[in-house]
Amino acid sequence: MRLFLDCEFNGFGGGLISMALVAEDGREWYEVVPCEQPEAWVVRNVIPILGKEPVSIDVMQRSLFLWLARFESIHIVADWPEDIAHFCSALITSPGRRISTPPLTMEVLKIDSQSTMPHNALHDARALREAVMHKEGI
């Protein structure tokens, strides 16, 4: 199953703020984690539209594990490499330990998508799904 990924983070190279995955069939997963010392741009453009209270990284990882376990195999699709980096980091739970996932592949596409709420990971992941599926004629 293709899962369309988007993340919001605290500036270029900054820590994760939110992550969303939208499956080809429309199923969605979205979590927000605490952001310590958010950059001014993030305070103005990301924090106000998160739409969800933050949870701990542990809670997010458990939620991610349970959601990913529903799929036989996973192909992550993102439009920005840093989204993939944050996703991979979220799979690591402690030194030498990670979330168990179904077989997993990834790709980064260059595609224009029009989010209904830019800088909200869930809306951006939905827009990425729509753009890719529209391009494929689905």
Spans of features found by a protein language model:
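Conserved non-catalytic scaffold segment of RNase H-like nuclease domains
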Residues: 3, 8-82
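Short, surface-exposed basic-aromatic patches at helix termini and helix-loop junctions that form
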Residues: 22-23, 92-95, 137
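Residue-level signal for well-ordered alpha-helical scaffold segments within enzymatic catalytic domains
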Residues: 66, 86-89, 130, 134
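Acidic, Mg2+-coordinating catalytic module of metal-dependent nucleases/exonucleases
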Residues: 80, 111-138
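Substrate-recognition/cap helix-loop segment adjacent to the acidic, metal-dependent catalytic center
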Residues: 84-101
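Short, flexible loop segments at boundaries between secondary-structure elements
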Residues: 97-116
